[in-house]
Amino acid sequence: MIRFFSFLLFTLFLFSCKQKTEIVQAEMKSFNMKFDLRLYSDSTYIFKSIYEFDSIKNETLKGKYKLVNDTLVCYGDFNFNGFIKNNFIESNDEYEKYEILNSKINSNSKIDFQKFPTYTIFTFSKSKGYNYFESTAISYELTENDLLTIDSILPICMNKTSYFKGVKNTNNYSKQCVATKNKNGEIEVWVNCACSGIAKDSYKYFIGAVYDGGHCFFRLKINLTKKECFDVVVNGY
């Protein structure tokens, strides 16, 4: 009897060891779409495309992944190369990322975005689109103090145009930031702004092109070192 129970316990132990567990769940939202990425302990992933009003387009992709430190590569149907940073899984190829909802792994988060709910940051790369910087620019990692500085400079920059007279803060705008250092070692940040009501479901996840919409969409550059703004562009003007 003792041998039987010992064998049973050993069998249950082996069975439990073979059961894969979810270690990361991340998602990207885009208007009426959602992309759900889940990583499992056996180095497999499941990637789902979910369409709210057109379920026939829903798709599930599966494959293997490799995670080394903060670098993530997915193989198979969902081909992805990126890294984990500030509670997001960010692409190396495009200005897009997935927000981590649940995780059993440690990741490097230098910014608490609960303090900055209207901001999101994308890592600069010359190979990505929307490259508004000089050819000598290199990537710079923004800090919480940098975001505070940007937040204080933005209203000043906006009030220099006729479209934003009297603006005291930018709380009603969602801000996407891409930061670099120029050849002089100065920190330059491209800031893409959109009315929060319009962009709330997408601004955290990807940078998209918008060519109209008036003052609900504008962008500019800020030299954090000199605390100056330039290249202000307001859609439709």
Predicted regions and their residues:
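Sec-dependent N-terminal signal peptides
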Residues: 4-15
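Lipid interaction determinants
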Residues: 16-62, 66-68, 73-110
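A short, structured loop/turn motif at beta-sheet edges
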Residues: 40-42, 64-71, 180-187, 221-228
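N-terminal secretory signal peptides
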Residues: 46-48, 110-180
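A mature extracytoplasmic/lumenal domain signature
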Residues: 49-51, 69-71, 76-79, 193-197, ...
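C-terminal partner/receptor-binding element of secreted or periplasmic proteins
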Residues: 91-108, 213-237
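Functional cores of ribonucleases/endoribonucleases
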Residues: 158-217, 221
